Amino acid sequence: MKAVRLHAFGGPEVLRYEDVPLPRLGPGEVLVRVLAAGVNPPDWYLRDGYTAVPGFNPPVTLPVIVGSDVSGIVAAVADDVRGFTVGDAVFGMIRFPSFGDSAAYAEYVAAPASDLARKPGGLDFVQAAGAPMAGLTAWQYLIALGHDAPNPFQTVPHRPVPLEGRSILINGAAGGVGHLAVQLAKWRGARVTAVASGRHQAFLREIGADDIIDYTATAPETMARDLDLVLDTVGGPSTGRFLRTLKRGGALFPVFLGFQDAQEARERGITVSMAQVRSNGAQLAELGRLLDVGAVCVAIDSTFPLAEAARAHERAASGHLRGKIVLTVG
């Protein structure tokens, strides 16, 4: 089969489209014929050797296939698998945050059955491939964590906060995690302030944002006040600026590493919490039901053939995405 692998770390040019062996099916696994694969930040973190994630240096054996998000058709199931049969349309985030010999940027993937859910009938394969990591990140930050694995970012488990009737600001609201978080927060009854470039204003209104701050015109931390929650999908060292927008007792949820203002957060009475998103087929099935009835939608920024994964990574690096980048397979 064809797959995209790394033989060395570096820029998009190190992504190699090449022949690799078909993955072997292990106990508890499903062989999926991949029709689309989502592109996510951990894909380019892996590609460049995690230089963008200081202090994070997991062991990686090269060559390695890239990617975690897939949608496709079940081609085979292990003898001990129940709930999936050959021909089922499925989607999922595979083995995240761990690694394996089989991954998403490929024509076939051997996936743990517990990582998969049936693809909603109202969703095409491209949209389905764009949903898993972004959707599960938003879900596990805002709705329910869904696992008891140790949190690598803090000593206590992440705990979502009630959303109904609360005011929430989402930074990076037009991006992959952000646009799904806007919709999930609205579904749970929150009032949502969306922060994004002004070019995304109509899109953000369409998906339910109550208020919009164009960060290219106004610093959002000077506009918003007395919020209950900030979900910062951009994160990094600048995420502390949102502390001043929160009321005492509020919460700041950075999605990416780099928060440096723990002392100020304590003085202001603000809870700061992060989560490590993990594969979860059951949660994905719940999200799938919302996608199927149109309560939540997946926006697609752009698509590229699997053979042009390098171009997809170049598009990601250019920034200002609206929704998800997806690779098409076959």
Roles of regions detected by a PLM:
Residues 1, 284-330:
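C-terminal hydrophobic helical "lid"/dimerization subdomain
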Residues 21-39, 51-97:
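Glycine-rich beta-strand-centered segment in the early N-terminal region that forms part
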Residues 128-214:
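Mid-domain Rossmann-like dinucleotide-binding core that forms the NAD(H)/NADP(H) cofactor-binding site
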Residues 222-229:
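A short acidic, Gly/Pro-enriched loop at the edge of an enzyme's catalytic core
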Residues 233-297, 329-330:
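Glycine-rich phosphate-binding loop and adjacent beta-alpha segment
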